[in-house]
Amino acid sequence: MRISRLILPALVLLLSAADEPQLVPDVSQREVEIQYSFTGADLLLFGAIVYPDGRRPDKPADIVVVLKGPEQSITMREKQKVAGIWVNADRARFRSAPSFYAMASSRPIAQIVDERTAAIYELGVDKLQLSPSSLNDSAELDRFQAGLVDLRQRNGLFVERPGTVEISDDVLYRARLPLSARVIVGDYTAETFLVQDGRVVAAAVRDIHVRKSGFEQFMAVAAERWSFLYGLTAIALAVGMGWAAGAVARRI
């Protein structure tokens, strides 16, 4: 009797999962190499929606894709002008701000899900959970968070493209998201969400690796493994280049 009580809920969960659609996502580049000439990349996120028994819903579903970079701890400083001089005034520290965030959706997010669902899945730069560690006042928190979002949007590190996901025949989807030239190396995630009637019914993730290559990779490895020799070499090069520039200037 006890075994049947354990098996029955598991069967119910399996049957309910079988009734939900599934996502089969992919991305055009699983690895992005950063070289000295890197000016950014344009990633294609695409895939298919698999419905149980091939039955498509009467009402078309929506797709939201989110590309996230490694999380960072960041400190924001607010400057104020005192006696004609700009000085640091207030500051705020965020423990887990994504280094990069890009989102595309088949329609504006407000038309797809409610505020609560958008906050749970972080669908939009205004829904990011940045984990502030040094602020208690909500007004200050909102001001600093808005400043961080604005700064990263101007640097191309926070991107929103509502209404740009293309869905064909209610089955195939595709979206393009830009990867800024300012991105850091690390592991990125490409998340895809399938939304029906305001509810996320399926989600899938693909990993993207951003790494340095060529001379940039050699310099990064050298700085990490042989930091002392790397520092001496950098100083020697700086002194040598300064001496050479002075010698050329004297001849001219």
What do the PLM-derived regions correspond to, one by one?
Residues 7-14:
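Bacterial N-terminal signal peptides
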Residues 20-36:
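N-terminal edge beta-strand
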Residues 49-52:
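Short solvent-exposed capping/turn motifs at the termini of beta-strands
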Residues 81-184:
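Membrane-proximal low-complexity regions enriched in glycine and acidic/polar residues
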Residues 178, 201-230:
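Short, aromatic-rich amphipathic segments at membrane interfaces
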Residues 182-212:
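Extended, hydrophilic extramembrane loops/domains of integral membrane proteins
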Residues 228-231, 238-252:
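Juxtamembrane interface at the cytosolic side of transmembrane helices
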